[in-house]
């Protein structure tokens, strides 16, 4: 019964994380229309493209959307990070639970 609860908890936390990631991605896509922030926020685009300044929206990396979202919408970004940590914790507990149950079965045989 505990294993089913952990699987449901893991599934729900993954869905919450994916939803919050989509929200952050959407909020960060505002970077394309905000030319002023290109040089201050699009750090990964500069690094990946090997350029000094971003001059076109096509040069902006998708990862920079998350940076822009964290800069302008920190609450949603913090919730996404917390939900990711919860996914990791739930996954760890599920793996630990399965491992402990297999050891108990193995010792009884």
Swiss-Prot record:
Domain of life: Bacteria
GO cellular component, one term: membrane
Keywords: Membrane, Signal, Transmembrane, Transmembrane helix
Bilayer-crossing regions: 73-95
Any Pfam family matching the protein: DUF4306
Stretch forming the signal peptide: 1-25
Location relative to the cell: Membrane
InterPro entries xref list: DUF4306, UCP007103
Main location: membrane
Bilayer disposition of the protein: Single-pass membrane protein
Record protein name field: Uncharacterized protein YjdJ
Organism phylogeny: Bacteria, Bacillati, Bacillota, Bacilli, Bacillales
